[in-house]
């Protein structure tokens, strides 16, 4: 089966400023993709800012700095209000109903992928990519979410609600690798 990594050319990478999303950018560049980066600014707390008076959190600055070093465009999307309304409020509501919420599952489907795909469309990207350790295969014209090859890093559980629309446009380059310490 051919891998999705060689089908299209332009990909929008969700960049956290961390090692995994940075590795994704470099891997996709090495594979010949035109890479663009985006950081979703979802939540600010004081520990996100290393310098008093700093206008943007460290992870945004780190993602932008990496994008500059890789010579790729970088965008920041401020979605703090929507994150509070969509993900945080749902988390609170579930606790008030005496349920155990899983905010990552809700965030990925109803929040991250929504914004990443909307921005990918706006920027005319064929795919989005993230640093999640999961894989996507195709069988009988259906996309199937599978566990990442590294059992210690597998993140497919947090992505289980993604549907065909989302999976058909998503790349997980790290899902086929083992994370080194």
Regions found by a protein language model. Give the residues of each.
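ATP-dependent adenylation/nucleotidyltransferase module used to activate substrates
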Residues: 1-161, 171, 177-181
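A short, charged helix-loop
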Residues: 165-169
